[in-house]
Amino acid sequence: DQDCLPGWSFYEGHCYKVFNLDKTWEDAEKFCTEQANSGHLVSIDSKKEANFVAELVSQNIKETRRTDFVWIGLRAEDKRQHCSSEWSDGSSINYQNWIEAESKKCLGLEKQTRYRKWVNLNCGQPYRFTCEI
């Protein structure tokens, strides 16, 4: 689609791909940056984009596990566990849809909410992830 690499999906000027690999948040972000110059874990800037990403994840992750989460490019950066004011790609947060704030610092999408709500997760846990370029 529209100048995306093979296997990537186009939406409003960006390309997206769900990876069925288990990585920590940090390793997933690093992996995404290695896919292309502008690659990062997905940043979700609107409800429409959230729906697109949720559908993409649902289509690409068929088998279920006890814990089904998918990393997005958001994590708390300071010691007080508040969320950082930007996505991992540097864009500002102007759309939010998380469940409840906990002490866990990285955010992911949860299968139980059909990948539409954001949940706080332990950054060191390996989960699958979505990259955006």
UniProtKB/Swiss-Prot annotation:
Residues 11-132 form the C-type lectin domain. Disulfide bonds join 4-15, 32-131, 106-123. Transmembrane segments: none annotated. InterPro entries: C-type_lectin-like, C-type_lectin-like/link_sf, C-type_lectin/snaclec_domain, C-type_lectin_CS, CTDL_fold. Keywords: Disulfide bond, Hemostasis impairing toxin, Secreted, Toxin. PROSITE patterns: C_TYPE_LECTIN_1, C_TYPE_LECTIN_2. It is found in: Secreted. The keyword Disulfide bond applies. One of its GO terms (cellular component) is extracellular region. It comes from the Eukaryota. Interferes with one step of hemostasis (modulation of platelet aggregation, or coagulation cascade, for example). Heterodimer; disulfide-linked. Belongs to the snaclec family. Shows greater sequence similarity to the alpha than beta subunits compared to other heterodimer snaclecs. This is Snaclec A9. The lineage of its organism: Eukaryota, Metazoa, Chordata, Craniata, Vertebrata.
